[in-house]
Structure formats: C-alpha cells, structure tokens
C-alpha cells in the first residue's frame, strides 16, 4: 500500500490552520539556504519513507458522503473504514495493517520533500564540483567516452553511441539534455578549452542548432584526457554505484588543473545559481603555482599572474573593479565590449566602416546584427548606411558601413550603449565544496583545488607504492628461484601436486605463497641468464621507485612540488595566448556625452527665461537689409535676450542678473524646432524666483590660462580664473558681488594678453588690457571699468584677441584709415537696426575708469545695442569671413555677412543692417567666426547649401 499523508486524531488542526495550509507550501530561497546547512544528506528528513505507524486520517471541509469509503479491493479487503463523529469534521479513519501506514503532517511533508528535491537539484544537477569543475552530466559523458575508448588518437564515433551509453548506465534522464551538454563541450565559442572534439555540425555562434546525434561524431580532446581522465585507474578518486547499482562511476574526476576556473560554469538551482567565467590556462597555472609557493599571497599578488577572465570569444574587458569584487567575494560584474576597428572603404569619399571581429561572451551574433538593423530602421542609431555579416570559417567579420561624414567613434559608442556589443558578465562563483554549495572567491577556489589535488596525488602515490612493493616482493622470490634453479626444478618434479610443490618451495626457501606461485608460473624460456638479469634490473628499478614514492609521501611540500611540476607540463603543452584584452580605463558605463555628437548648435534665451536648442542649419545666410526669419513664437510681453553658438558637449555657464552662475551641458537643453517656444530655464536650473539669465558662456575646456571677464550695467568689471567654475553645484555659485541697484550683464572668456572693448549706450568706447584688470576670487566685487555720464549705461563688451593687438598698435588714427579694407574693425549694432564697421586702430588704449572715445553718432531715439571685434580671419580679398546674427525683440532673426557692412568713421551713422518695421528693436546680436562656418559646412541641409551654421 502506498504511504498516505495524515494527521493523528490528537493533532487535528483548527480551521484557520487548514485555510493557511497553502501559504505553508511557499518556500523562499532564503528558507532553503537557512535549512540546507541544517540538514545533511544523511538526515532522516531526506529519507522518503517514514516508519512511525498510526491510523491514517483524511480531512475535508465538506460534509462527509453517505456510505463507506472503500480504500481498496481484493487483497486490501482486510482494511476497514469506519465513520467518525461530526466532532472530527467528517474525518474517516482507516484501520488495518498499521505497519504499512505512515502518519505525517502535510505541511511538514511538503517542506521536507521540497527540501529533498532542492538538495537533489543542487548536488546532482545544477552546480559544479569545485574539485573537477564538472556537473554530474558532464562528468558522466566524459567517463562514458573514456570507457568506450574514444581517445583522441582513435577514430570518431557517433554521438548517439555516447548518449545511449550515458543514458543506459549513468544518467537516466532525457537524451536531449545529454546531447546538448555533449555539444557544448565541443564548441570552441562556449568553452575556453573544449573537452570534446566534434566532427560535423555542432552549432554556431549564431545559435544555429547542431545536427541530430545520429549524424554527428565525437571523441575526447587531448586536453580532457590529460587534465581530467589521467590516473583514473589508479585509485585516485572514489567510485560510487550508478542509479541501478549495476556498475560504478567516479564521484569526481582526478583533475590536474582547476577546471572550474578554466572553462567556467553556469547553472540555476533551487534558491541559488552559479555563473563562473572562463580563464586562460597559462595564467591559471601561473596563479596556481604562485599560491603553492606562497599560501599567504594577497589577492593583489595573485592578480599579477591572472588579472581577469579570458573569454573564448575574446572581446575587451573594461576596468578591473568588477573583477576585483568577483575574485574577492565571489560576486562581481565584468563589463565586456566587442572588438571593432575602423576601416576606410573609399579614400575619395572618405567613407568609413566599423568592422566587428569579436563579440562579448555568450552573445548571439545573428541576434546582434538583427538588433543593429532594427535600431537603424527606427532611427535610434544614426550615421549607418548598411550592415552585413561577412563571417566565414576564417573568423568573424561584421561590416557596418557609415554614411559620408559619419563619426566612427560616435557610432561605436552608440553600438556599445544600445546593443549587446557591450554586455556584462555577472559572476556568482558558487560550487559544491565538501558536499555543500558555497560562494567562494578566487583564492578560496584555488585552495580547495590544491587540497583536492594533494589528496589525488597522495592516493595515486600510495596506489603505485602498493603495486611496486607487491611486484618487488614477487621479483625477489623469482630471483631466489633462479639462483637455485636446479634445486627448484628437482623439488618441483618430485612434488606430487601443485599445492605440495608450493608448500615445498615455501618451506625450503622461506618464500610466501605468492612468490612460490610466481616461480611455478615461470616458463622454461625465462630460465636463461638474460632473463635473470631482467628480473634483477626490475628489482633495482622497483627499489628506486619505492624510495621516491616514500619520499613523496613523507611531506606535503613534496606533493605540492609534484603538483606544480605537472601543472607546468600541461601549460607547456596546451597553453594559448590570451583572447580577451584588458582596458584599464573605466567600468565601461557610457554617459550621454559618449553617444551624442559634438555638433555645433544654436541656443536662444528669452527675457522671461525660456531657452531652446536648435540645429546649426536652422537659419540660412541672408543679405544685409532684409527682414530675416523668426526664431520662433514668444510668450506675451517676452523678448529675445541672448542668442549664441555652442557645441553639444560644451559646459554652458548661465550668469544671472544677481551675480549667480549655473551650469549644464548643452545637450541637456531640449532640442526644439525653430517655431517652438522653448523650455523654461527653471526646469533645467535651480534658479530663484525673479532671477533672470543675462549672459551665457559656452566652455569646452576649463583651461588654466583662461579667465572670465564680467561687466555690470553700471560699469563694474571683474576678472576671475575660468577654472574656478569647473565644479558648479546644481544650486549655482556666486560669480560676483554686486552693489545695490546694479546687475551683472556681460561675461566673456579672455586671456591675460587680450584687450577688452567696452561701449556705453551713448556710443562711448574704451579699450583696456585684460592684464590690467586684477584677478579676483569669485565672492568679491569688481572695480570701475568706465566712467559713465548723464545716467549712461554699459551697452556691450567684447574681447580683442592678443593676435590683433600688434596690428592695432602699428596703425595710427589717420584719415587714410577711415576706408581701411583690412581688419580688425569694431562692428557697431544699434537698437534701430543700423550698424557700421570702424577700424580698431581708430581707438586708443586707456586705463580703467576713463570716459573713452565717441564711436557712434546716434539718432535721437537710438542707442547702441552691441559691439563686436571683427576681422579675426580674412578672405583672399582681405575682407572679413564672419557673419553676424541679429535678433529682434519679437524674435525675428537675421544673419548677414560682416563684409557687407560698410567701413565708416567714428562719427558716421552707419547703414541699415535689418529692417525692423513691426519687429521692435534689436534685442541681441551674435558673431559667427569663419572657423565655425568651416566646421559645419558638411552638416547643412539641402535647402541651406549656401548657409553656414551658427
């Protein structure tokens, strides 16, 4: 009768317990881990049969059915069923042969049965043994092939033969699981050192399935024979009975190297899992020898010999922090990148291609190529024109053709970020150690293997010693017989039987029974003198062998030396160069800046604090005196405040009217179309209520010799080192202390050799040297820059580079210079849309706190809006290559060439630059250099071929 789970009458649970029975069956992985070490394999809880007899009781929450509950028929008729009273909730008691009834509470049985199942999965299926690095199925496959004589020197045999042998003798599970395990041990892209040589289709890195087992053939790899299966017949490991007790199989293979680290392992058990990366054989031997020589070696010392895993598919391991964690604690994250190189496809068009030659471990190449194609299709990856897989038997080659002008580094970074070309290997180094699953670091794994290998070498030495001693004992008896051959022959011929001859030899020469038997088995041809010499030589050889074995077994040091020697021999025979390269740069995590092109862009800020970022080709080049193109719709009573040119990777410094500076990357500002209103700055910066941004400075590098020159509306100037602004916190920092009623308006980058040009709203211009402005700290006030009259205010400021100072100093203010055709010039822009160029040599340098020279003759309702130094670079005809962007209060933008603006004297009124009509006044102006124009010529749209980006 099958045992039935039951409760005894005295232990009937209450209804609440019955209702919560299902929750009792929910076992967590934490319960398994807590319980595992509490119950060894020999614990009674792991037994399937219970011996305590009692009555079997069935419980039901429903009313019992009428009649008798028949438990069985035929021979079970002696069992009787009787009804219980309602007090027992309608239970039925089965009485009969109580020795065949097993009472047990259901929730306990469920817990313990699940625990037994979990232990079975842990120890017998999912986790590898730290000694030979194999799971039971892999061990049984290799042992079955060894028993079938499928060595590397013999012909291949069908895989179906191996699978059948494994299933029939050692592994009574599905043939698919066995064949899949066999196939994986033959794949060079799955194991760093394959253990089986395959003949036929064994799958591919594209996840193509292998051919059926009836078609493929296999045999053992020489490395498997040398590392795992040698000395198997010398009592080096224990053998256990197979599933039906018909024969024996090894409990572990006598590995000569830590195969768990050599090929790694992965598996999912109940409540725990393992994922161990593969390593290089040569480095593994080196670190093993280092630990043998110095058992107290630190992890850093071991890393000098084996710095990181070595994956069979190669790749680049990024950083060593994850490797250190994995080797120290057993858990870590190793970031692996595929290996790619840039190849020039067409020298004429300068089109490039990214060639992928290696991919991360356990990455499906076909899936990777398909994923890249999908990302190109949905515009996630840009700059790619074609992708194809040219891989063959000679190696991997995935070609990704780039569009003309595409940045290979940017495309690669996007591939790393959006595809499996960069992936992480999560190490979880769990293995079976001393019959229990254990999380171990590198040193602990190596030490566990060394202890096991010492045991194997000791058992092998004792086995050889025993055989040598037995053989020497026999040889000594044979030599005695040969020394007395005539007497021995006479004694044997006189003996009446075999047993009497044996007894006579023992008594006559003091031989043992085995020695006497050996003498009787000698043939006549071995009685020659030559044969006698062979026996004596063998005796001497055995004596020497016994001495060496006894010396080996005398100390652990000798055993460790032999382990090291055998490991070095394997290294000399099987080692190969490292495939996975190490890059000691970072963890491989890509920031936004790594995947965003450093393109030039336009940034517009309104008076009410709205900002937007636009593409460089948004505004085309126009002629002087035209209306221009709108920069977008503005809110009611809003006007354009600033309009500048920057690059996506620049740090953009936002200076407020209160002297506070904020910072963000340019690409973090949302990109908008020309007609969009923009994003409020308060959503990007932590600005105070009522605070306005008055100046924006893009910075690509915080150089030591660069400064920020700040100028307030009331003419207060200050110079601060640019490096002090490299670490601006999110809430901003103080840039300048302001006097009451003053506000910060202009901030420019400069060097000590530059000049600064300042202009007031009434047209007064002053030139001063930047080195004449003392460098101050951030949290200080400035000094007076320009003496202002009649409630005049500062209108603009610009920097004159040091390269232009020499030209300016060589020229004097002369009438012949009024129409000077070579720069540099000061470009004046008025609020009413007028402007002109005045030679820079028309203005003399002065110290700070001076009135300056008049530079413009205004109409009654006009004032100066901006001043720029132009003429940094000239065309072949000596004219300026720069352009100026004008923005009106209504948001209309016009971009014109500087060369189209007339060169006039200081007292002239200028020419019309932009017809304002209903657009209000000029709100801001920005200058575009010729270098900026050249950088972005290839990025303009077809509709703006003649345009240059801002």
Curated annotation (Swiss-Prot):
E.C. number(s) listed in UniProt: 5.6.2.2
GO (cellular component) term, any one: mitochondrion
Role of this protein: A type II topoisomerase that negatively supercoils closed circular double-stranded DNA in an ATP-dependent manner.
Coiled coil: none
Record-annotated active site: 215
Species annotation: Arabidopsis thaliana
EC main group: isomerase
Protein name: DNA gyrase subunit A, chloroplastic/mitochondrial
PANTHER family, per database record: DNA GYRASE SUBUNIT A, CHLOROPLASTIC_MITOCHONDRIAL, DNA GYRASE/TOPOISOMERASE SUBUNIT A
Highest rank taxon of the organism: Eukaryota
GO molecular function ontology, one term from the record: ATP binding
Statement: the UniProt record of this protein carries the keyword Transcription regulation: yes
Catalytic activity: ATP-dependent breakage, passage and rejoining of double-stranded DNA
Occurrences of domain Topo IIA-type catalytic (ranges): 127-595
UniProt subunit comment: Made up of two chains. The A chain is responsible for DNA breakage and rejoining; the B chain catalyzes ATP hydrolysis. Associated with the mediator complex.
Family assignment from sequence similarity: Belongs to the type II topoisomerase GyrA/ParC subunit family.
């Amino acid at each position: 009768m099958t045992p039935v789970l039951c409760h005894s009458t005295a232990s009937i649970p209450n209804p609440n317990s019955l209702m919560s029975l299902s929750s009792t069956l929910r076992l967590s992985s934490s319960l398994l881990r807590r319980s595992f070490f509490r119950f060894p394999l020999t614990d009674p809880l792991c037994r399937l049969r219970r011996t305590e007899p009692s009555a079997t009781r069935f419980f039901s929450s429903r009313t019992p059915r009428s009649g008798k509950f028949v438990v069985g028929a035929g021979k079970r008729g002696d069992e009787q069923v009787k009804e219980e009273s309602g007090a027992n909730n309608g239970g039925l008691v089965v009485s009969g042969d109580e020795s065949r009834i097993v009472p047990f509470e259901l929730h306990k049985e469920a817990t313990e049965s699940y625990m037994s199942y979990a232990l079975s999965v842990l120890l017998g299926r999912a986790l590898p043994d730290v000694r030979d690095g194999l799971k039971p199925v892999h061990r049984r496959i290799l042992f079955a092939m060894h028993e079938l004589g499928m060595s590397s020197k013999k012909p291949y045999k069908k895989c179906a033969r191996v699978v059948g042998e494994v299933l029939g003798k050692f592994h009574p599970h599905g043939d698919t699981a066995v064949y899949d395990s066999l196939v994986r041990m033959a794949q060079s892209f799955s194991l760093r050192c394959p253990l089986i040589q395959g003949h036929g289709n064994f799958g591919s890195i594209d996840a193509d399935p292998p051919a059926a087992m009836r078609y493929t053939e296999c045999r053992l790899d020489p490395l498997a024979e040398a590392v795992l299966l040698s000395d198997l017949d010398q009592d080096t490991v224990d053998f256990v009975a197979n599933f039906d007790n018909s024969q024996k199989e090894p409990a572990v293979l006598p590995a000569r190297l830590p195969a768990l680290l050599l090929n790694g392992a992965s598996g999912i058990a109940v409540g725990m899992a393992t994922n161990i990366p593969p390593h290089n054989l040569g480095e593994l031997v080196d670190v093993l020898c280092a630990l043998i020589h110095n058992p107290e070696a630190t992890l850093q010392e071991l890393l000098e010999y084996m710095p990181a895993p070595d994956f069979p598919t190669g790749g680049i391991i990024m950083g060593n922090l994850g490797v250190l964690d994995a080797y120290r604690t057993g858990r870590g994250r190793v970031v692996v990148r595929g290996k790619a190189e840039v190849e020039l496809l067409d020298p004429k068009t300068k089109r490039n291609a990214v060639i992928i030659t290696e991919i991360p471990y356990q990455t499906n190449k076909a899936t990777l190529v398909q994923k890249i194609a999908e990302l190109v299709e949905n515009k996630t990856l840009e700059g790619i024109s074609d992708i194809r897989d040219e891989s063959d038997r000679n190696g991997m080659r995935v070609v990704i053709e780039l569009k003309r002008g595409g940045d290979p580094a940017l495309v690669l970074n996007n591939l790393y970020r959006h595809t499996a070309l960069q992936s992480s290997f999560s190490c979880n180094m769990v293995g079976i150690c001393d019959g229990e699953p254990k999380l171990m670091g590198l040193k602990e794994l190596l030490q566990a293997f060394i202890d096991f290998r010492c045991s194997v070498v000791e058992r092998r030495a004792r086995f050889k010693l025993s055989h040598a001693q037995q053989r020497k004992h026999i040889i000594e008896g044979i030599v005695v017989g040969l020394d007395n051959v005539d007497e021995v022959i006479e004694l044997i011929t006189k003996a009446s039987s075999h047993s009497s001859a044996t007894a006579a030899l023992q008594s006559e020469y003091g031989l043992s029974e085995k020695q006497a038997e050996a003498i009787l088995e000698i043939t006549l041809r071995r009685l020659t003198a030559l044969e006698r010499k062979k026996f004596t030589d063998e005796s001497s050889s055995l004596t020497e062998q016994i001495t060496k074995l006894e010396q080996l077994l005398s100390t652990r040091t000798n055993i460790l030396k032999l382990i090291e020697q055998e490991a070095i021999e394997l290294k000399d025979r099987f080692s190969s160069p490292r495939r996975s390269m190490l890059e000691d740069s970072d963890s491989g995590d890509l920031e936004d800046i790594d995947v965003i092109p450093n393109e030039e862009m336009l940034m517009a800020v309104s008076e009410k604090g709205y900002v937007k970022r636009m593409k460089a080709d948004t505004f085309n080049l126009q002629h002087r005196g035209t209306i221009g193109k709108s920069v977008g719709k503005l809110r009611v009573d809003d006007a354009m405040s600033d309009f500048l040119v920057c690059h996506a990777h620049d740090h953009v410094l936002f200076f407020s009217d209160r002297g506070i500076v904020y910072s963000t990357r340019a690409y973090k500002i949302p990109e908008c179309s020309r007609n969009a209103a923009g994003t409020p700055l308060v959503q990007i910066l932590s600005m105070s209520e009522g605070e306005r941004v008055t100046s924006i400075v893009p910075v690509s590098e915080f150089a030591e010799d660069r400064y920020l020159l700040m100028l307030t509306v009331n003419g207060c100037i200050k110079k601060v080192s640019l490096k002090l602004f490299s670490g601006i916190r999110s809430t901003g920092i103080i840039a300048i202390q302001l006097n009451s009623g003053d506000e910060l308006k202009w901030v420019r980058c400069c060097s000590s050799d530059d000049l600064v040009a300042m202009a007031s709203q009434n047209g007064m211009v002053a030139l001063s040297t930047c080195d004449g402005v003392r460098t101050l700290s951030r949290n200080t006030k400035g000094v007076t820059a320009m003496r202002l009259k009649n409630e005049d205010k500062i209108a603009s400021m610009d920097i004159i580079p040091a390269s232009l100072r020499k030209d300016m100093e060589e020229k004097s203010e002369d009438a012949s210079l009024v129409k000077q055709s070579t720069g540099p010039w000061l470009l004046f822009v008025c609020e009413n849309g007028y402007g002109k160029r005045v030679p820079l040599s028309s203005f003399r340098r002065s110290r700070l706190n001076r009135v300056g020279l008049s530079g413009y003759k205004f109409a009654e309702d006009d004032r100066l809006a901006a001043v720029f130094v132009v003429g940094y670079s000239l065309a072949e005809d000596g004219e300026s290559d720069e352009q100026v962007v004008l923005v009106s209060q209504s948001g209309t933008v016009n971009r014109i060439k500087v060369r189209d603006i007339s060169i006039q004297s200081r007292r002239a009124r200028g020419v019309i630059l932009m017809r304002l009509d209903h657009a209000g006044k000029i709100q801001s102006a920005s200058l575009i250099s010729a270098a900026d124009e050249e950088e972005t010529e290839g990025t303009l749209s077809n509709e703006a071929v003649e345009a240059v980006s801002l």
